[in-house]
């Protein structure tokens, strides 16, 4: 079956970008702004402090769910202020606890291997976060993130119908491809989702980030979960 890549945001579009403080999301926001889009940055607030920061001789490493969230938000706010980008923090702690942490514990106790990132993307990042944006009365054309994946649409209708739903497809950089973590996102959500880094390699992302002198280019790559 033949598939067509969906168009990326264009000059004049209003785009909400999910910012984590990392190089991928930061560069995504900057590239869209330079393209002429009105960019609005949003960050999820997940950390509730329930896990001790010091566990004997071990310390929680920086990750999406950790005390480093405070620093991440500060860096996102600084980046947005420097680049004249509207910025919001959306509290999704309850949804993260219910859909990710409780799921993780239940799977682990049942002897199964959990995948918290799939749950988070399906129910939090592309679920609760978008609901939070709606509650802020933010209107937008697209929601973008720095994921390495792309949105495609089948040329022919599925199952002999005229239905041509948006789907997740592999990014150019196979070593960073994240389609596995995104595959549960419903097609109706994907209609307004775009991944501007789909055609770039991680090497190109870092090169551009250094060229634009982004502080995020000097950070270590983010780690999933805790």
Residue ranges of predicted features:
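Anionic-ligand-binding alpha/beta catalytic cores of soluble enzymes and soluble regulatory domains
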Residues: 198, 203-226
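A short, charged helix-loop
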Residues: 188-192
